[in-house]
Amino acid sequence: METTLILLRQVLIMFLLAAVGFTAYRAGKISNEGGKTIGNLLIYVSLPAVIVKGFLVERTTERMIGLLISMAAAAVILAVCVLVARLCFKKDAIASFGAAFSNPGFFGIPLITAILNDGAVFYIAPFIAFLNLLQWSYGVSLLTGKKTGLNAKQVLTAPFMIAIAVGLILFFTGLSLPSVLTKTLDFCAGLNTPLAMFAVGVYLAQCSFLKMLKRGKLYAVSAVRLVLIPLIVLALLTVIPGIGNDIRYGMLISAACPVGSNLAVYARLHDKDYTYAVETVAASTLFCVVTIPLLVQLAGILWSM
């Protein structure tokens, strides 16, 4: 129960931050260009800082084994996400993309660090990496209807991949950063939650809530993304032995996060229904304030038995 209350409090704080972004956009203080700038700061500054910071832990056999377990778990969970989403929304590319891909980087990390610690980010880095690789390949193919391969240069120069590479080097070499760099990293990482929620608020402000309420597909996508897939993942994490609670909770929350904001980015990039994509992101984000705490509470009951 204590974990659930901590998580619920964190979710409420995040939604208050989203309300700031919402109000600022509606008041004309954040423009569409300003929203893009916030997104760029997230992608190129705060999220990489959070990832690198997560790797600044002591190298132990336990952590190395945990990293391998988290890689295997992330691969299995994302395969489940893609398969379930495809089965549920065969003819709707945006719905299938939205149901398959969550938002662990911007939404999951603040929740995971709230109930665990900054070091738990270490275990969800593989999930974030694999998810983005799938979005670039399978996700784009889904939206365009064309088979696309991975662009090696794009993958290797992506901010999150560079951050993971730097983090792994620091972890395996045991190098210590000077205090001035770790403090700078702390400040940049601290931007992640407020910037991410300001961005969510901007997305919400672009939506007509009356139209959203009338679009039945949004409820279906949210149900699959926030309830069906997380329950399947919860079952898998419960029955598979040898997985520590840091990895369990990290993977569960990553899989239970709302629709990733990249859906709207890719929809606009490939001339798909941008409004529908934004509404899908917004609706699932609103609903997750209820689903994530309940899911974590259920996990706490099952994993304490």
Residue ranges and their predicted role:
Residues M1-M305:
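Alpha-helical transmembrane segments of multi-pass small-molecule/ion transporters
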